[in-house]
Amino acid sequence: MQHKVRLTVIDKKVYPELQAAYCADPNAGPCPCYHVGDTFLFARYGAADDFWHGGLHTLCQTAQTADGTAGGDVPHCSEAWDAISRYIYAGLQGGSLMRGWMREENTMIACCSDGTRPVLFRIERLDYKAVYPAALGAPDAPDAPDAPAQ
């Protein structure tokens, strides 16, 4: 089995009263790096390795342009990456993202740590391809040598 991970921006929050009280720019507004509905796809097999490049060029869908959008022509925001990368890595390896906490163990909801304008993400492990080790003689593998007679 091989795995990909789909990341979707499901919500953005902004707390103007906190920005006014604490931020150098009291009118910072919502996060400019992500847009609700942005979708990213991560793969890590063969020559593909989206994880180690901070998710650069993983953006698949956006209501905006890829220019300046995280995962497009720029890597993911470091605050967001710190919150989501552990789940992306676990998913790419086929691991449970949050067994016993979420309804489905292949899904996690996480958010970045920006306290005045957090972005919320749905992270999903996608199980997509069975890998048959024909070279090892797996009897059910396509084009595998016949299993030894019993």
Predicted features, each with a name:
Residues A21-A48:
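Short, flexible N-terminal segments of the mature chain
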Residues L136-P148:
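Compositionally biased, intrinsically disordered low-complexity segments enriched
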Residues H3-K4, I10-D25:
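Short, structured beta-strand/loop micro-motifs enriched in basic residues and often containing a Trp
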Residues L7-D11, R44, R125:
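Short, structured patches in soluble enzyme cores that scaffold and shape functional sites
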Residues C23, C31-C33, C60, C77, ...:
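Disulfide-bonded cysteines in secreted/extracellular proteins and peptides
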Residues A47-E79:
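Short, Lys/Arg- and Gly-enriched loop/turn segments at beta-strand edges
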Residues S78, D82-A138:
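Short, compact, well-ordered microdomains
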Residues M1-H3, H35:
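Function-determining sites in protein domains
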